[in-house]
């Protein structure tokens, strides 16, 4: 009797690495997680030790096997999903990184991004990459490493150094240096990849003086890239056959295969991605254009809006204000509120994300009265998450010309029923919460499994991640629009407040 076969997903995140084993029904049968240290050399800088990331991945692979008694020989394929944009540069011969990995959040390369803007490259880079010029993306991080590590530029020009985002680094390590590849979704976040022509862009590479030889080969999101070296996978030589950046993996895990389908992951922040089909659509309203996924020679583009503060607003209520003891408690407090929703919290603690991109804005509260209670404040904070999502969804509809009918949701805060119902009400559309909230890892597993025939085709996947719960809009139109207009006024007032503060400083 043959042994049952499984797919392993490696989910390499910003603070921890996970390995999850799925069966053919898309069910999680085993998982292991390990955190690794964050490095903060200066204010605003965030780095990781790339070898500590690799060690954490080896540890969780072993942990997933131990927990389940599944053997490496039972793994049909491996899928990888990862924190996007984070940049590693390493020695091609020794495999040793020449500097720490510079993390997506890090602002140490902001002066390079600012110089590119001042030199007038914004339009060219946006049209080619779909991105805004920002330190967020990999391009400025590579330039910074080549500038700050002695001899790095010369070594890169000699072909002695390799660059990769975390997906590339992990495949290179798992295959013992045999394979240097990335996928469409990760390449699209480097600010070096022409997402229309599907090539590394020579003009941008020349502008930043980044040697092309450093860059990995770009592959589709679902194909066999190589096999694990046996001594790096506990004796197993297993195909690595699926890769996608974390948010694109979640889009795929949510089965958002058709144009107009949208997913939102309610994590620390909120990441909303819309499948726009095979036509690249540049945003006129500060959304990012990116690649959702590419399979079998066909690329699906996407629009993305990032909200900085979502679940972390609930953490603020718990840890900062001590209004609640646990995050789930926020739902009970909000349901106990008897207010007419006249209180607005604008959680711009680190500025406002899409579609405003106002880094100077700071948090504010409007509409307080003597009768405002703790319950009202908690409810207003939860509602702020839903209002921000509407800001992005409305913008997506304008940019794409597509009428969005449903929002597919996952992530920790998606478990809050009150928030999900209010989200449905304020958008006026259905909210479909996934039955399996492991959508990021599941997306990577689906991509890997398709490449090796573990699942026959994308239609076969549609049975595997059914809707867990559907929230239908029940608020009348006039009330919905009145509440949302109040939110827009609150955001405008928040922005004006910081603008006037800046003007006062300039006048001194």
UniProtKB/Swiss-Prot annotation:
Region forming the signal peptide: none
Stated regulation of activity: Activated by phosphorylation and inhibited by fructose 1,6-bisphosphate (FBP).
Gene3D superfamilies, sorted: 3.30.420.40
Post-translational modification: The phosphoenolpyruvate-dependent sugar phosphotransferase system (PTS), including enzyme I, and histidine-containing protein (HPr) are required for the phosphorylation, which leads to the activation of the enzyme.
Residue positions binding ADP: 14, 18, 268, 311, 412, 416
InterPro entries: ATPase_NBD, Carb_kinase_FGGY, Carb_kinase_FGGY_CS, FGGY_C, FGGY_N, Glycerol_kin
Pathway field: Polyol metabolism; glycerol degradation via glycerol kinase pathway; sn-glycerol 3-phosphate from glycerol: step 1/1
Superkingdom per UniProt: Bacteria
Binding site for sn-glycerol 3-phosphate: 14, 84-85, 136, 246
Binding annotation for ATP: 14-16, 268, 311, 315, 412
An example molecular function term from Gene Ontology annotations: ATP binding
UniProt: glycerol binding residues: 84-85, 136, 246-247
Modified-residue entries (Phosphohistidine), positions: 232
One GO biological process term: glycerol catabolic process
The protein's assembly and partners: Homotetramer and homodimer (in equilibrium).
Function in brief: Key enzyme in the regulation of glycerol uptake and metabolism. Catalyzes the phosphorylation of glycerol to yield sn-glycerol 3-phosphate.
Protein name, as recorded: Glycerol kinase
